[in-house]
Amino acid sequence: MDNKFSIFKKGQYVLDLGSFPGGWSQFAAQKVSHGNNNLVFSVDIQNMDAIPNVIFIKCDISNEIEILNDKFHNKKFDVILSDMAPKACGNKQVDHANIINLCEMSLDIVIKFARENGTFITKILQGEYEKEFYQSMKSNFKLVKYFKPKASRKDSSEIYLVGLGFKKDFQ
């Protein structure tokens, strides 16, 4: 994904929502860190092993958003990632609605904490509410693209939306 969209650059601040087990955080830290600067903030409800140059915050963004306000103060992020996924129940429509709900919560965090022209990447499941969420992304970003990793099964409804060029003045 980074090869296609050139997302990460040295010195950027990155927020990783739903960071457990830490793959995205580790990759981002390798791309953006210089020296011993902590430029990546990881947030999850599950504890995560320590990663160099990553600050981990344990919280549930659905009901503990004030924790992020306290930790970030007025910090703005260049890149916000959301790989959050609810526990699957096996019903495709319910699972889809639940992940879209997490995407909407993530977008609210983007609106609050993203730097102008920032990037937002979120995992979604294709389905009934996908186009509505895509339109919400288009309202907030100059460009929105779909991305399906090569490693993803062809029959999987899991896909990523990549928002480029956050329109801070829209708010």
Swiss-Prot record:
Recorded catalytic activity of this chain's protein: uridine(2552) in 23S rRNA + S-adenosyl-L-methionine = 2'-O-methyluridine(2552) in 23S rRNA + S-adenosyl-L-homocysteine + H(+)
Keyword flag rRNA processing: yes
Subcellular location: Cytoplasm
A Pfam family matched in the record: FtsJ
Disulfide bonding pattern of the chain: none
Binding site for S-adenosyl-L-methionine: G22, W24, D44, D60, D83
Annotated active site: K123
Gene Ontology cellular-component annotations: cytoplasm
Domain of life: Bacteria
InterPro entries: RNA_methyltr_RlmE, RNA_MeTrfase_FtsJ_dom, rRNA-MeTfrase_E, SAM-dependent_MTases_sf
Keywords: Cytoplasm, Methyltransferase, rRNA processing, S-adenosyl-L-methionine, Transferase
A single MF term (Gene Ontology): rRNA (uridine-2'-O-)-methyltransferase activity
Record has Protein biosynthesis as a keyword: no
EC number(s) per entry: 2.1.1.166
Family designation: Belongs to the class I-like SAM-binding methyltransferase superfamily. RNA methyltransferase RlmE family.
Function: Specifically methylates the uridine in position 2552 of 23S rRNA at the 2'-O position of the ribose in the fully assembled 50S ribosomal subunit.
Name the UniProt record assigns to this protein: Ribosomal RNA large subunit methyltransferase E
Gene name, Swiss-Prot/TrEMBL: rlmE
